[in-house]
Amino acid sequence: MPKILDEINQPNDIKKISAKKYTQLAAEIRRFLIANVSKTGGHLASNLGVVELTMALHLFLDFPEDKLVWDVGHQAYVHKLLTGRKNDFKTLRQYEGMSGFPKRKESDCDAFDTGHSSTSLSVAVGLVKARELSEEQRKVVAVIGDGALSGGMAFEALNNAGRLKENMIIVLNDNNMSISENVGGMSNYLGKARTNYRYMDFKGGLETALKKIPKVGDAIVTTLKQSKDSLKHLFIPGMLFEDMGMTYIGPIDGHNINQMLTALKSASRVNGAVLIHTVTKKGKGYEPAEKEPSKYHGVEPFDIKTGKKLKINSEVSYTEVFGKKLIELAKVRNDVVAITAAMPDGTGLTAFGDVFPNRFFDVGIAEEHAVTFAAGLAAAGFKPVVAVYSTFLQRAYDQILHDVCVGKLPVVFALDRAGIVGNDGETHQGMFDLSYLSHMPGLTVIAPKNSWEFERMLEYCIDFDGPIAIRYPKNTAYLGLEDHKKEIIYGKGELIASEEEIALIAIGSMVETAVLVREHLHKLGLKATLVNARFISPLDEEMLHQLTKSHTLFVTMEENVKRGGFGEEVSVFLCEHDYQGIKHLNISIPNMFVEHGDRTLLKEKLGLDAESIVDKICRQRGMQK
């Protein structure tokens, strides 16, 4: 039987498909997504939930003239499929392959590069204003999930969107999930609206009945519609969106293409911003994903029949070590509380929330609030631990500096996914945190070399009287160097092996690489000292002074961009103390955005692997391997 999906090879091809075949096409799209993502990995549940919604948008819009902005963008697979990128799915999130997020350079049907949450509405308002200034006619639609709507930036955009005089359509994809289940007032508000279909039915029936009243029926309906105290305010508390100046349509079934098209066409005739509230099911069409949508949000290659990963990793990750250790510490200290921004699973805090439900706080996608909320807890005598991906902590820079560091409050920042993350690409690499944290006055920044040291550092963080950040990679916890268990002392590194000539000074995850580098150098007849820096801020200047006495080459290693990183700080130290006889190799990430690909492969491409580092050292020493 010929596949309908085979007929869609270019943008707008879906408009050639008969409406009678929409259901079959939706089923084919789901099978295609499951088959391909099971091989490459990627975001599955969110994309399965927006199949019909995306089809309706593509039937309504003309690409690339019209502009469709996806919030976060991980749910844009169906959009990519319908815009001629079907054959690229075999390279999804692979090195030099198709991105898992919208990319303007990938297709002119992608209106904006996204990756972080709650940005779409601001982008759409900008596109609408640009359309107005350019006197163009294109449609502008933003798709945002109910989870992303909990972000403060989304509210800032809504505040401005309500003042628009020209048409802009916001599609609220309400599946009651971000990655994990949503929390907070907005989630509760949408829950009430979601279950209030009776209001829509009652309103429609009442309107019909009133219009049948001779002579005055139409006038009564008009008066009710114009009144701010009309029936909608009795049945839907607040009508938040309309009170902000927008027209609200919904809630409607996001899996019903005809309903979606009717709503979109109606919305396009309104001057100003219109919000279409759609209700969808995350993971729809694949039973394991429907039952456990958070588990299938982001997946590694898996067996379709069982839903289980193809590769079972028995090794423990840093995230797992963190979650287990924090529970242990919280059992000893009643002042320890944990905070996450909609990532309890990803940051390893789900079990903590089960054990200590009253001391666990999921604030939704609101990193700025999470940090200042933690500051408030710290000011009142608690020990808050903010667990967050490195890339997302960027969003709370001012709160860290102004609300935590100025007051020297004892907040712990646990930075997961620090360094090269891999397949999610440039918007998710955690390669900037050392640069934007290490210059903050009073903020201590540390990184562990292995699992044992990670646990000791977490203990140190809980006891530390001041703001402190600990960074660790998306990786299995390193178990090497298990005999090196020197006590953690403020501002002091750890000397692992002492020789002469070359000093290998590594931070966190790069200590494991430095061990391999040293082994290679020995085979080449080169001596090398190995230092586990431990502290990025403050710098262990005493150890650096000592190393200058017997070494002619410093090799610093870090998973962070060169500018503002650990290596640059060491360079400044050497310059300020006029150590002209010391050469310095700064092994770090170039000042560039690193795209998607396997973590190990990306490290090789960036010259962060042991072999590449040895090559650089040999060239610096004027010798060949």
UniProtKB/Swiss-Prot annotation:
Catalyses which reaction(s): D-glyceraldehyde 3-phosphate + pyruvate + H(+) = 1-deoxy-D-xylulose 5-phosphate + CO2
Transmembrane regions listed in the UniProt entry: none
Pathway linked to the protein: Metabolic intermediate biosynthesis; 1-deoxy-D-xylulose 5-phosphate biosynthesis; 1-deoxy-D-xylulose 5-phosphate from D-glyceraldehyde 3-phosphate and pyruvate: step 1/1
Organism placement in taxonomy: Bacteria, Bacillati, Bacillota, Clostridia, Lachnospirales
Recorded superkingdom: Bacteria
Family that this chain belongs to: Belongs to the transketolase family. DXPS subfamily.
Species of provenance: Lachnoclostridium phytofermentans (strain ATCC 700394 / DSM 18823 / ISDg) (Clostridium phytofermentans)
Quaternary state and interactors: Homodimer.
PANTHER family reported for this sequence: 1-D-DEOXYXYLULOSE 5-PHOSPHATE SYNTHASE-RELATED (PTHR43322), 1-DEOXY-D-XYLULOSE-5-PHOSPHATE SYNTHASE, CHLOROPLASTIC (PTHR43322:SF5)
Note on cofactor: Binds 1 Mg(2+) ion per subunit. Binds 1 thiamine pyrophosphate per subunit.
One GO MF term attached to the UniProt entry: magnesium ion binding
Enzyme class, first EC level, given as a word: transferase
Pfam families xref list: DXP_synthase_N, Transket_pyr, Transketolase_C
Name of the protein this chain belongs to: 1-deoxy-D-xylulose-5-phosphate synthase
Gene Ontology CC annotation, any one: cytosol
